[in-house]
Amino acid sequence: MGSPLLRKHAAMSDTPTVLFVCVHNAGRSQMAAGYLKALAGDRGEVLSAGSEPKDQINPVAIQAMAEEGIDIASGSPKILTTEAVRDSDVVITMGCGDACPFFPGKRYEDWELEDPAGQDIEAVRGIRDEIKGRIEVLLSEILSAKV
């Protein structure tokens, strides 16, 4: 029935690696990574990066995630590298798809999400909640692909 959703990671484990990419790696991708880490536990590896990373994570995104009991304050924005894409099974872009290197055999998705930069907490909560719903769907797909 076609190819599997995920290629098994060829490293030491068979847990899939998911890379979240947004322009600044300060809001959307950090929230998505935080949710997947919290919900997947050791069932997956999570990376995040940005094509033009900021110096720090958006404080309103940190606040919105803290309301969910998820601490993303200890992270820091990272530059997107070819290696990060190559080492991932699933690449989720959020507004920067063209900046992401393409490797055959990867699963790519582009999530159209509003940028939380400059937004108030109410707006960021809405973005956060949309990300959570998408993460729950992604996680169910990843877990069913491993069976």
Please give the residue ranges for each predicted region.
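Short polar/charged helix/loop
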Residues: P4-V147
